[in-house]
Amino acid sequence: MTRRTSAPETAGPIIEAGKNCWRQETASRFATLIDTADYFAAFAAACRNARQQIFILGWDFDRRERLHRADELDDFPDELGAFLVALVKHRPELKVYLLSWDFNMVYAAERELLPALRLRLQAPPRFHFRLDGRHPKGASHHQKVVVVDDQVAFVGGIDLSRWRWDTPE
């Protein structure tokens, strides 16, 4: 048996438009956000500038999480759910689409109960929140993506949720 010690020289690209992704685009800016403090600040800033739509996909979402924003100069609340609801109420053209995993009961002690119902009672009809429970047994909805006005995207491993807050310190 021969062991391979390096990748084959003929290896092609991993991502191929139309095959394993929709298309490829070039970003004019890119940054890595490691700490939740930086992510929440960038998320809040992007959302405050939103005019058309905000798409949020997450493994967990907790409307009670505080964004811990340094700039408390605007009139928007610091609590995540209230912040998003206020944005939608303030901007008549803005729509929010939020999809979160309908979690396993193992996580019930650390999750907010009935988040979709609570937000529906507060939010205008342009705020759409759904829980994803359609997946194989033992699986979960694990994407963590935010897209604002098709201009700014956050893709990675941080949920807009409790238990995620950290700083470089």
Where are these regions (language model features)?
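A short, flexible N-terminal coil/short beta segment enriched in small residues
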Residues: 1-9
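HKD-type phospholipase D/PLD-like phosphodiesterase module
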Residues: 8-49, 53, 64-169
